[in-house]
């Protein structure tokens, strides 16, 4: 009896999902490693500006629902078991109940099999955006970049649009798209000026804006509307901000780059800060280490810290041993000082940092 009931519930859920998909003409799946939340917000704002009744959904620890009819966002309250891709069915139901014309969702799946379930059995997006292919979640998606690209490529839609950047895997993605009768649009960063990016009060990379602009192109939305719409997007809670701190005796700039969890994104942030002509001489670099992400710390040791001329490197959080060992072994000739504040409380961290500012 239990098996029969489960089968009936499964069929009902599948039928409801199909009905809800048919009610929402535009469905956008934002995939990739870094910047998905920001791109989701930019696209949601473009579609809203263009007059579509649009619902957006970001994921992660600060998951949000965004609605065309209100400025406030709804915080997604997770069930006790934590994030689960089944919540996407509830998002789909909510958007359909509101009679939304467009649904823009950040892919919340990391496991390659779950990514395919998210795309083909839940959202059924007719526009897929692959933001980038970077080294992260290697334990689940890797261990190589090729395997990460394969996971993203598997989510390319049939008879739809693929929006992505020009990268080492562009031709690979194009071949899959061709086999699936899907049109490819490559984001054009030349359309995004520094003057435009300076209008945001948080850091936006050219890729973020050009990808959103390309989605507008796929839907026939004029560029003026796209540019105007993006400026209306609220920043993600984890968005990177540059903040000046201090007083008449202290002029210090704090760059919140903790949202960047992979080497390339972190180095890109550093290069972008230099491009914007902030003072980057003798910086203090703070690395937040996590016990469940020791592999990430090790990657930063090999691929990030040697590339940044650093006055002081500070390790906080848990399991900073890879950094300590590398510094003691002379792997960071570019780092003048190293301070290990593993497991230190915030007050202790600030007490240590204040004399250095």
For the regions a language model picked out, list residue spans one by one:
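Active-site beta-alpha connecting loops in nucleotide-dependent enzymes
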Residues: 258-333, 338-342
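Acidic, Mg2+-coordinating active-site environments of NTP-dependent enzymes
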Residues: 98, 125-246
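Beta-strand-turn-beta hairpins that frame and shape the catalytic cleft
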Residues: 245-254
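Structural beta-sheet core signal
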Residues: 56, 128-130, 164, 284-287, ...
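Short, conserved loop/helix-junction motifs that constitute active-site signature segments
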Residues: 119-125, 154-159, 276-280, 303-311, ...
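Short, charged/polar "capping" segments at the starts of alpha-helices
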Residues: 64-66, 113, 168-174, 292-296, ...
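ATP-dependent carboxylate-amine ligase catalytic core
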Residues: 18-24, 45-128, 132-149
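Short, basic phosphate-binding NTP loop
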Residues: 1-31, 38-50
């Amino acid at each position: 009896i239990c098996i029969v009931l489960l089968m009936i519930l499964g069929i009902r859920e599948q039928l409801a999902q199909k009905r809800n998909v048919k009610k929402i003409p535009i469905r956008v799946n934002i995939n990739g490693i870094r910047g998905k939340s920001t791109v989701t917000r930019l696209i949601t704002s473009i579609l809203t500006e263009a007059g579509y009744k649009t619902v957006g959904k970001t994921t992660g620890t600060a998951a949000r629902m965004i609605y065309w009819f209100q400025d406030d966002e709804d915080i997604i309250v997770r069930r006790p078991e934590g994030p689960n891709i089944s919540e996407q069915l509830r998002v789909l139901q909510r958007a359909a109940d509101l009679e939304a014309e467009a649904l823009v969702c950040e892919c919340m799946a990391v496991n390659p099999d779950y990514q395919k379930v998210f795309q083909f059995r839940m959202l059924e997006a007719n526009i897929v955006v692959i933001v980038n292919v970077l080294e992260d979640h290697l334990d689940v998606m890797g261990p190589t970049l090729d395997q990460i690209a394969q996971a993203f490529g598997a989510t390319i839609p049939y008879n739809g649009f693929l929006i992505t950047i020009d990268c080492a895997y562009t031709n690979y993605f194009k071949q899959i798209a061709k086999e699936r009768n899907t049109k490819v649009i490559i984001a054009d960063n030349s359309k995004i000026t520094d003057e435009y990016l300076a209008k945001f009060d948080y850091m936006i990379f050219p890729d973020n804006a050009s990808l959103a602009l390309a989605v507008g192109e796929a839907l026939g939305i004029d560029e003026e509307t796209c540019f105007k719409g993006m400026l209306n997007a609220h920043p993600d809670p984890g968005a990177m901000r540059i903040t000046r701190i201090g007083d008449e005796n202290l002029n210090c700039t704090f760059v919140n780059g903790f949202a960047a969890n992979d080497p390339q994104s972190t180095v890109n942030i550093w290069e972008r800060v230099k491009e914007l002509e902030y003072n980057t001489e003798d910086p203090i670099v703070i690395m937040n280490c996590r016990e469940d992400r020791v592999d990430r710390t090790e990657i930063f040791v090999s691929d990030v810290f040697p590339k940044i001329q650093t006055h002081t490197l500070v390790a906080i959080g848990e399991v900073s041993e890879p950094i300590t060992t590398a510094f003691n072994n002379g792997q960071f000739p570019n780092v003048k000082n190293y301070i290990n504040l593993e497991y230190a409380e915030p007050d202790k961290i600030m007490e240590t940092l204040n004399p250095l500012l």
